[in-house]
């Protein structure tokens, strides 16, 4: 993330201020300078607040950021533009406040924009979602931003001294190590699921084992006493258990089969005895009923005599009935003959009337034939009448269009000839344009090289002048420095260390006398007077301090000048003067103008030729289209003429309407004549068919009448013969016998029933006598008791066998399930063993007690420390090295940092360093962290860093080393900003962002020393 522009309104001491960071060239190191309280740190607060809604230091609340001099009606807001991964973003955050005159607070606002095609497009417009968008975009939260981008007062060393858990949060974000923690959680859940499945399988095995039936058998009970956790023993006992269960089942089955056989024997005996008893009873009953039936024999004989007489008179009765039917048929035939004769007379009359109509119709035959001939000849014309009608309508229009198309075609041909004359022999020359473009490009390149060389030479002369001026200043300051050092060397430094011993000497003098032995040197005291001029010593010390201060200031100036010379030398080395053309700039410009004019002329000529060619092609296409239309017109005109000629030749008409009217009239007349003729023919045909039918009917009726008369005569003869055979003299005898016919069916049924029952009794008595012959009837009660006893025993054993068989099969199913569970469990334990081990290792149960994520973070921290030690060695004069504390526990340690002192060859806690040493270590660690993050693909772009204070704790030599380190960051593409009150930094750092305050508001400006 690299700042581009910062705009502050009513923020801290800045009422309305803008800072343009784009003025910082090539990622220069710059100093933010100003008096205490001027608002230097507020610049860092503004950037942090714009991004996260918080200050750069945790102690400052949001309410503390609003200016006390702000207009009560105006909000506090910060607009911050920055670059990230070659994309530009802008954020605008407005703080909440109570507007003057209101009692309710105006809510905060936050907008996030991204530049697309030179314009800002909004991405978020809500405070919470917008802040989350920034966190995801930068890859850090506010606390991590303070440790990576902005190192505020009091927090610069926070990453250095933070514990493992705090470092873990920062490094996790920087190096995207959460995926390793996710892996650990996934493995943990997998192991948990697998263990639950394994435990569940053990429970299923135990449940199945407990449900196995023992049949109250000691052997099986002994086998079931094995614990279910001993799965190998279970596998060993299962075949024994199954074998013993089969033995028990076989024993029960044997008892069951014996009981079934005994029951079947008694069941058969009981059934046979019951059947015999029933047969004896049935035989006795049938004999009694048979005797009663024989008593009806006389009555049945009388019935049979009546039935015989009824049967003998049947033929006579049939002849009498037949006579009546024949007489009825004769009467009907006579009626039919009379009706048919009348119908034939009516049909002959109708035929005579229709013959008259036919003769009248045939008189118009010649006229109808002529009309049919006309219709046949002109039918094809009438069917396509629209075609001929359209030809009459289109012929005049087509003549006019043809003449117009001919005129237009002639005009286009003349235009084409004119265009061809304009083109002549000219052709487009694009190769010449390419050649001229290449020439112009080469000339422009030569001109640019000359201009760049002139600019580079001017810059070089300027830099050489600056360098010479700096060298002269260094020479002058070196000369002054030598004089001061000579002057310093001339001072008598003896007794200078007694300046602060005046009170000590006075105390000794008051405690001794002349002649005493001196407690310091042991000599005899000769005099107690003032032998030392303390005022003179103090004066010399002040003079020496002043000279030393001047020497220190001159050395600082020389160091600054040397740094500036180094910077100038870098710029000089970057200046490149290229080889240029021998021609002057004036000659090249003249050649450039000539070639550009030639290029424009050739382009105009090519454009004209292309336009003419395009016009020629257009005219050619138009001529082709006109010719096609003219050809089409001529073809259509010829077709119309041919159709009109055809119509007039065939129809002899020259008017379509008259032809249509006559044609339709002829068709109507012909159709009417044909329909009437057909109707008459149909009527004659129908009359002829009807007469033929009636004639056939008449012949049929006459033949029937003759047949019926013959039948009647034969039937009378048969009646006389039957009456003679039956000795019947008149019809009264016949009527009496006929009266019996109403009872005939009842009499026949009574006779047949008697004979049927008589026969059935004979058959049944014979059958029962054969079944009971030579058989003894047993005691039914004794058989019944024995039957119930055997049946109960059999049912009991069948139930027992069914239960044992079911339990045996159930035992087999359960033991098979147990074996299946055990096999699956063994395979599952084998398959999951590696996952269990891996889960324990990544969870920290290993020889280093490290989780997978911390192991990865330790790797990155080691790289960061190694990179930091490269600078720390320089800054500490090869005394200190940062090392990672090796002590770890429970996977959450291993990220603490200690310092190794090469002078004592021992490591010690980081808190034992002095303030300056802590600053050196923190700076080296911060720079190492940023460089390792840049090398890795953690998704965070650390393109800038801002440091607030810390340099005041450094001595002169360490300060020089730290500044050189920060200056060298320019080559890594990092922007570095520093807040410090150290005066030497103003001389060492060329670019300064100066913050001035007038006790009311502050302002900023960039300046160069």
Curated annotation (Swiss-Prot):
Function: SbcCD cleaves DNA hairpin structures. These structures can inhibit DNA replication and are intermediates in certain DNA recombination reactions. The complex acts as a 3'->5' double strand exonuclease that can open hairpins. It also has a 5' single-strand endonuclease activity.
SUPFAM superfamilies: P-loop containing nucleoside triphosphate hydrolases, Rad50 coiled-coil Zn hook
Sorted UniProt keywords: ATP-binding, Coiled coil, DNA recombination, DNA replication, Endonuclease, Exonuclease, Hydrolase, Nuclease, Nucleotide-binding
Keyword Nuclease: yes
The UniProt record lists the keyword Nucleotide-binding: yes
Record GO terms (molecular function): ATP binding; ATP hydrolysis activity; endonuclease activity; exonuclease activity
Descriptive protein name: Nuclease SbcCD subunit C
Gene Ontology biological-process annotations: DNA recombination; DNA replication; double-strand break repair
Pfam family, one: SbcC_Walker_B
Quaternary structure (record): Heterodimer of SbcC and SbcD.
Family note: Belongs to the SMC family. SbcC subfamily.
Binding site for ATP: 34-41
Coiled coil: 176-364, 392-502, 535-802
Organism: Staphylococcus aureus (strain MW2)
NCBIfam families reported for this sequence: sbcc_Staph
